[in-house]
From Swiss-Prot:
One of its GO terms (cellular component) is ribosome. It comes from Chlamydomonas reinhardtii (Chlamydomonas smithii). The lineage of its organism: Eukaryota, Viridiplantae, Chlorophyta, core chlorophytes, Chlorophyceae. One of its GO terms (biological process) is translational elongation. Plays an important role in the elongation step of protein synthesis. Residues 67-107 are annotated as: Disordered. One of its GO terms (molecular function) is structural constituent of ribosome. This is Large ribosomal subunit protein P1. Belongs to the eukaryotic ribosomal protein P1/P2 family. It holds the Pfam family Ribosomal_60s.
Amino acid sequence: MSTSELACTYAALILHDDGLEITADNINTICKAAGVEVEGYWPALFAKLFAKKSMDDLITNVGAGGGAAPAAAAPAAGGAPAAGAAPKKEEKKEPSEEEDMGFSLFD
């Protein structure tokens, strides 16, 4: 995305947030106030876009692109237990005799 395109996008969002009409003149005014040089056709293109499409519709449909994440991992091939199978009880690790005595070279 070019700097000009990004500046026009931000200008359109600012205008929408302030409740002002999104026109090429208003976009140019904001870009000039920000000190960004924009090619003359960008503000006109954005003004035409927002004349046809609502900014609210574009904002709410942002997540439409890209693939969805899988709901769950696929089970491994072979004899993997089913998801509904009872989980095995974890055995408690008993400390060895050396750990109980507290003898260590690095204590």
